[in-house]
């Protein structure tokens, strides 16, 4: 093994904050740093990193160690793998012990697979520039906006025919069996033949697999072919481009998610080095956990604006919202992907597009509404209930509450209704809830007419009210047929008996329950009965005069008729002074 002196030299050279900050989001707290522990689920940070002591400790689960131990525990590295990674990072030479001189330490399977992938990557890069048949792949990359510097930066390559690949690997002492273990073959055939190769790296830059894109329309298979699952290639956890974007993501707590590897690399190369893509499979909860470890709070979804892209945005957005991340959906113009949009509009155009992103809930409602052939009240109710069920899983109660309020605003329904649907009150026994019936709207004319009739009906021995009503009005002045019928009956009774009609006899005249309720249910101030009666008479007289004037115009040939009506109205107002005798404190004529 390596000498103790060289290992001590490595330990003293390691900056533990630098190492751990590439994997978790650290926040300074005095002389130490704290974070949510990556080894157990927690919301309050209990994971403390001590730079002076070069160690970490979690007060929640008890995890403890140095940078070497962190890589072993967090990434599953062996001790040898961890020290080799760190020695490369901090440029420290590890010295073999004398007895091991000329002896290569035994390699584990993971290290062997990384070595095979590294050799294959080097060969693929060579093929892209030197094989005649690769010129079409190179032209395709240039056409997509990849410069030679970009191609070199991301180690892009070309997959040759199977026979040439096997020959090259054999020269490097790599057997076909080892290539099968590393995931280069499916059903005995080389997976990446005649395709552009995108190497996939882990967080520390090791080549752990490949994604191969076809560039000729007549090529067989899907657009992308990926390395199958291997001991070092776990698609459910790998975020393509993370080795280039990790630092900025952890620093700014935001990430841009795209669908394809080419899109991801073009985004990073254009300055958006907080971009990643899911590797070959659908975006999963494991991917979300990887982002959570970096402290991501804001997620921008930059997917193709087709049906598949929108469905992916709905699913991925919900996963991120559930992890208490704020999700925004950026809508690309139809027919564009991030790569083509950058080529046409440039970085400034994409920045402007990102600034116009919709929040996830607005996008969700818009997509769901458009999925209905017809969107009516029933569909609206179903959509609100579906959205509520989804929102209730989005993190803390406060976040859920705020999203429910936003839902109410988007769907134009009362907030209290949405909140009650989300949190129904459960009682021990069912209660009879009174159902409020819709109260028919009552016309003001009916109210005025029933006010006059109420005064007449409840005037008792005050026959002056009956006399005044008889003097000023006739049954035809009442518009409602029931009011007209009752007024005629009461005046007829008064003229015959010189007294008020008994209440029960008056009720028998009515067949409309609404009029009877207006006469009996509404409160009547009997002490101000005379005033109420006079005011109601005045309203009735004004209505009658307006109706008489309505058909008239200002034409000269009818001017005399209009003046005649006006004289009648003035006389009518003068005649009201008779009513004021009933109430000395009231002056009806100004």
From Swiss-Prot:
<dbReference type="GO" id="GO:0006269">
    <property type="term" value="P:DNA replication, synthesis of primer"/>
</dbReference>
<dbReference type="Pfam" id="PF13155">
    <property type="entry name" value="Toprim_2"/>
</dbReference>
<keyword id="KW-0808">Transferase</keyword>
<feature type="binding site">
    <location>
        <position position="259"/>
    </location>
    <ligand>
        <name>Mg(2+) 1</name>
    </ligand>
</feature>
<keyword id="KW-0238">DNA-binding</keyword>
<dbReference type="GO" id="GO:1990077">
    <property type="term" value="C:primosome complex"/>
</dbReference>
<dbReference type="InterPro" id="IPR002694">
    <property type="entry name" value="Znf_CHC2"/>
</dbReference>
<protein>
    <recommendedName>
        <fullName>DNA primase</fullName>
        <ecNumber>2.7.7.101</ecNumber>
    </recommendedName>
</protein>
<comment type="similarity">
    <text>Belongs to the DnaG primase family.</text>
</comment>
<keyword id="KW-0862">Zinc</keyword>
<dbReference type="InterPro" id="IPR050219">
    <property type="entry name" value="DnaG_primase"/>
</dbReference>
<keyword id="KW-0548">Nucleotidyltransferase</keyword>
<dbReference type="InterPro" id="IPR013264">
    <property type="entry name" value="DNAG_N"/>
</dbReference>
<keyword id="KW-0235">DNA replication</keyword>
<dbReference type="GO" id="GO:0003899">
    <property type="term" value="F:DNA-directed RNA polymerase activity"/>
</dbReference>
<feature type="binding site">
    <location>
        <position position="304"/>
    </location>
    <ligand>
        <name>Mg(2+) 1</name>
    </ligand>
</feature>
<feature type="binding site">
    <location>
        <position position="304"/>
    </location>
    <ligand>
        <name>Mg(2+) 2</name>
    </ligand>
</feature>
<dbReference type="InterPro" id="IPR006171">
    <property type="entry name" value="TOPRIM_dom"/>
</dbReference>
<keyword id="KW-0460">Magnesium</keyword>
<keyword id="KW-0479">Metal-binding</keyword>
<dbReference type="GO" id="GO:0003677">
    <property type="term" value="F:DNA binding"/>
</dbReference>
<dbReference type="GO" id="GO:0008270">
    <property type="term" value="F:zinc ion binding"/>
</dbReference>
<comment type="function">
    <text>RNA polymerase that catalyzes the synthesis of short RNA molecules used as primers for DNA polymerase during DNA replication.</text>
</comment>
<feature type="zinc finger region" description="CHC2-type">
    <location>
        <begin position="37"/>
        <end position="61"/>
    </location>
</feature>
<dbReference type="Pfam" id="PF01807">
    <property type="entry name" value="Zn_ribbon_DnaG"/>
</dbReference>
<dbReference type="InterPro" id="IPR034151">
    <property type="entry name" value="TOPRIM_DnaG_bac"/>
</dbReference>
<feature type="binding site">
    <location>
        <position position="306"/>
    </location>
    <ligand>
        <name>Mg(2+) 2</name>
    </ligand>
</feature>
<keyword id="KW-0240">DNA-directed RNA polymerase</keyword>
<keyword id="KW-0639">Primosome</keyword>
<dbReference type="Pfam" id="PF08275">
    <property type="entry name" value="DNAG_N"/>
</dbReference>
<keyword id="KW-0863">Zinc-finger</keyword>
<dbReference type="GO" id="GO:0005737">
    <property type="term" value="C:cytoplasm"/>
</dbReference>
<dbReference type="InterPro" id="IPR030846">
    <property type="entry name" value="DnaG_bac"/>
</dbReference>
<keyword id="KW-0804">Transcription</keyword>
<comment type="subunit">
    <text>Monomer. Interacts with DnaB.</text>
</comment>
<dbReference type="GO" id="GO:0000428">
    <property type="term" value="C:DNA-directed RNA polymerase complex"/>
</dbReference>
<dbReference type="InterPro" id="IPR036977">
    <property type="entry name" value="DNA_primase_Znf_CHC2"/>
</dbReference>
<feature type="domain" description="Toprim">
    <location>
        <begin position="253"/>
        <end position="333"/>
    </location>
</feature>
<dbReference type="InterPro" id="IPR006295">
    <property type="entry name" value="DNA_primase_DnaG"/>
</dbReference>
<dbReference type="InterPro" id="IPR037068">
    <property type="entry name" value="DNA_primase_core_N_sf"/>
</dbReference>
